[in-house]
Amino acid sequence: QFENLLMCQFVNDGDSIFKMAELQRCMVDAWTVWQDYTPLAARPLGDVPVWIGYDPSRSQDDASLVVIAPPQVEGGVFRIIDKQSFNGLDFDGQARKIRDFCRMYNVVHIAIDATGIGQAVYDLVRQFFPRVRKILYSVEAKNEMVLKAKQLIAHARLQWDNGWTD
């Protein structure tokens, strides 16, 4: 792991849980493939329901927010519509960013990592979005999320814009 994290040596695809070929199948030209998506509009998906996932900022790492459009039909595709990172925001600032996204999208579900300091962001978001879901991470919860992502990626049921390289 030292070589991967600090020496810029890549993990062998055979040793990775997410295979490169599977990940590449999830990459689409969102501007043309997603007919209901207008990225530069005030409301890029109009009234299409979306979910927000939020990992609050701790001390020096960035906070991360994703907007996901769940499938409209059984067995359909989950689309990662938007992703943002924030740095240097206090709890109020982080909650305001989430509220901004609630104005931009038809948000029907928000899940926040409320482990540790994330509790404060969760409490603030709950004031304007009472249905917010609190996630308290454990080894079991993380394993469950990775396995679900593996399943979606292996079956090409997750998509994101091919212009994203991070």
How does the language model describe each region?
Residues F2, N12-S16, D62, M104-V108, ...:
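Intrinsically disordered or highly flexible coil/loop and linker segments, enriched in small
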Residues A41-P44, P56-S57, F101-C102, K150:
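A general structural signal for short secondary-structure junctions and capping/turn motifs
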Residues Q72-D166:
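Mg2+-dependent endonuclease catalytic cores in nucleic-acid-processing enzymes, primarily RNase H-like
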